[in-house]
């Protein structure tokens, strides 16, 4: 949900920070105080169209920032993570600056992003009713997803099975496409792979050969230095006045001393062990010198072989092992190409089998969806009746293709769209085309009542959805908005006292003059202040004790409704 909103130098707002809570927050105030400006700022934060006109006169830029706290599994986190944006502690911070030149600077959790990315993340967080671009319920491409969410568990298992099968189907299609690409390219690949294999096989490579030869070359190329170093080491150990003789003399003296002090026996043993180790090392050095030889012919052969291997490395890999692995890969591909007709036949048979399975699975999906569509239709009609729109018709249409056979897609074959008719005798039309005129607010409210828990958004904003209604319709609208706020945070600008009475938090928007300029202020109303404001909404300028009593009655009614639901 939206926890905090900060607005600076936006329209008439100089600086404003508003904290929001869960449930229903209603914003009221006199005309022109800045209620819709706050909603405009949120719309801009969610990726709406920006303009230099939004920047307060005389300022360089407008700044809007919103802090959202979400459930760990909210889809916004997956989207942010895919874009390399860190989202710590379940928080997402959106920020947008608009300069007086009309340029936008967008950030998510401090990272610069494009306006498109800001819009994509923003629309998964908030749905604004009142700004057409945020009315996700009007978007046809959302209707199948909404229907599936409404269906819940009965559909999920079948849909998951279909998706897994569809993924395998696409993989087989890609393999078949690779095999059936144009003959000229296949012939070129065949010639290339055959040439490469012939060249690699002619080299008679052995795994790890390059590493072994490089080690041997190092030894042969430095044979003279190697001989001198080993010979000097040997001479330092063996011979008169050399290392072993000195240690042997020391051992004799320690042995004599230990006859007077037994404690030296351990030292004698230790020195004797070291003597034997050095003696063994001396013999090893002697044997090494006896075997050491310099073979110029062998060195030349190694250099030649390493040069040959280096040429292959430049073409096929950075080591002999990598070249061998590459050869194995192209050998498989070559075999596949040379036997492609058999492989194509095999893939086509597998695809046909899988296609039949997909038809069965997609048909099962369609049947479930059509059953759920009837339940959804009845639920929507129930909501419309509660809003005194019993003559409005709602339908979920499953579009058919001209050929009758629908293509497989990630979520099945169904092309679903919501249709509506607001007048008896008139045919239903696509929801987006009917969405105009005074009744649309109630229609959208009915839809949102059903789908508020299925859209994924955490916050729903209603910007004066109650214009032009009163009486029982106004009370019905208030109750629907309250119902939506149970599952989603709702922010609502309203002129209806019935809606204001339902508020969990009532914010009053006012404007004042500071330094010769007007700015907007927001404050949360306390109990008595709520009565005063609702009475003002009922009566206008002239408030009486009667209007205050009416306001209290509305608040009592709202409390009763909340307690019973």
UniProtKB/Swiss-Prot annotation:
<keyword id="KW-0547">Nucleotide-binding</keyword>
<dbReference type="InterPro" id="IPR027417">
    <property type="entry name" value="P-loop_NTPase"/>
</dbReference>
<dbReference type="Pfam" id="PF02463">
    <property type="entry name" value="SMC_N"/>
</dbReference>
<dbReference type="InterPro" id="IPR004604">
    <property type="entry name" value="DNA_recomb/repair_RecN"/>
</dbReference>
<dbReference type="GO" id="GO:0043590">
    <property type="term" value="C:bacterial nucleoid"/>
</dbReference>
<comment type="function">
    <text>May be involved in recombinational repair of damaged DNA.</text>
</comment>
<protein>
    <recommendedName>
        <fullName>DNA repair protein RecN</fullName>
    </recommendedName>
</protein>
<dbReference type="GO" id="GO:0006310">
    <property type="term" value="P:DNA recombination"/>
</dbReference>
<dbReference type="GO" id="GO:0009432">
    <property type="term" value="P:SOS response"/>
</dbReference>
<comment type="similarity">
    <text>Belongs to the RecN family.</text>
</comment>
<dbReference type="GO" id="GO:0005524">
    <property type="term" value="F:ATP binding"/>
</dbReference>
<keyword id="KW-0067">ATP-binding</keyword>
<dbReference type="GO" id="GO:0006281">
    <property type="term" value="P:DNA repair"/>
</dbReference>
<keyword id="KW-0234">DNA repair</keyword>
<feature type="binding site">
    <location>
        <begin position="29"/>
        <end position="36"/>
    </location>
    <ligand>
        <name>ATP</name>
    </ligand>
</feature>
<dbReference type="InterPro" id="IPR003395">
    <property type="entry name" value="RecF/RecN/SMC_N"/>
</dbReference>
<keyword id="KW-0227">DNA damage</keyword>
């Amino acid at each position: 949900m939206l926890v905090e909103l900060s607005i600076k130098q936006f329209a008439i707002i100089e600086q404003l920070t508003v904290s929001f809570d869960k449930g229903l927050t209603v914003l009221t105030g006199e005309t022109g105080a800045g209620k819709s400006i706050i909603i405009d700022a949120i719309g801009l934060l969610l990726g709406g169209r920006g303009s230099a006109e939004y920047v307060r006169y005389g300022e360089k830029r407008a700044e809007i920032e919103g802090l959202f706290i979400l459930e760990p599994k909210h889809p916004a986190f997956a989207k942010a993570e895919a874009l390399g944006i860190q989202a710590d502690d379940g928080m997402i911070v959106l920020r947008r600056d608009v300069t007086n030149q009309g340029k936008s600077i967008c950030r998510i959790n401090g990272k610069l992003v494009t306006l498109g990315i800001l819009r994509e993340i923003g629309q998964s967080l908030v749905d604004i009713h009142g700004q057409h671009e945020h009315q996700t319920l009007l978007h046809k491409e959302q209707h199948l997803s909404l229907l599936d969410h409404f269906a819940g568990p009965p559909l999920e298992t079948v849909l998951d099975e279909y998706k897994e099968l569809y993924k395998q189907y696409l993989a087989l299609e890609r393999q078949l496409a690779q095999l059936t690409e144009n003959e000229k390219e296949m012939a070129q690949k065949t010639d290339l792979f055959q040439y490469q294999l012939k060249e690699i096989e002619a080299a008679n490579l052995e795994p790890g050969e390059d590493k072994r030869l490089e080690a041997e070359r190092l030894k042969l190329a430095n044979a003279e230095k190697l001989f001198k170093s080993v010979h000097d080491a040997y001479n330092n150990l063996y011979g008169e006045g050399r290392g072993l003789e000195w240690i042997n003399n020391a051992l004799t003296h320690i042995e004599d001393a230990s006859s007077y002090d037994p404690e030296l026996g351990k030292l004698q043993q230790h020195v004797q062990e070291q003597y034997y180790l050095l003696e063994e090392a001396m013999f090893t050095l002697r044997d090494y010198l006896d075997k050491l030889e310099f073979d110029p012919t062998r060195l030349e052969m190694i250099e030649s072989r390493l040069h040959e291997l280096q040429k292959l490395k430049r073409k096929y890999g950075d080591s002999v092992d990598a070249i061998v692995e590459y050869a194995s890969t192209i050998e498989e591909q070559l075999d596949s190409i040379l036997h492609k007709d058999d492989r194509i036949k095999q893939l086509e048979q597998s695809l046909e089998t899988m296609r039949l399975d997909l038809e069965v699975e997609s048909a099962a999906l369609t049947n479930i969806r059509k059953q759920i569509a009837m339940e959804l239709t009845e639920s929507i009609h129930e909501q419309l009746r509660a809003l005194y729109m019993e003559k409005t018709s709602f339908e979920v249409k499953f579009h058919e293709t001209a050929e009758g056979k629908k293509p497989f897609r990630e979520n099945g074959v169904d092309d679903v769209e919501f249709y509506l008719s607001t007048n008896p005798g008139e045919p239903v039309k696509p929801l987006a085309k009917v969405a105009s005129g005074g009744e649309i607010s109630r229609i959208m409210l009915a839809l949102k009542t059903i789908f508020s828990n299925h859209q994924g958004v955490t916050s729903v904003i209603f910007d004066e959805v109650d214009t032009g209604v009163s009486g029982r319709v106004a009370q019905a609208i208030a109750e629907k908005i309250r119902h939506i706020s149970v599952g989603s945070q709702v922010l609502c600008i309203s002129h209806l006292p019935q809606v204001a009475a339902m508020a969990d938090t009532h914010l009053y928007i006012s404007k004042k003059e500071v330094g010769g300029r007007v700015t907007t202020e927001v404050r949360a109303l306390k109990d008595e202040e709520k009565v005063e404001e609702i009475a003002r909404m009922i009566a206008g300028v002239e408030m009486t004790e009667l209007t205050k009593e009416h306001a209290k009655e509305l608040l009592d009614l709202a409390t009763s409704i909340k307690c019973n639901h």
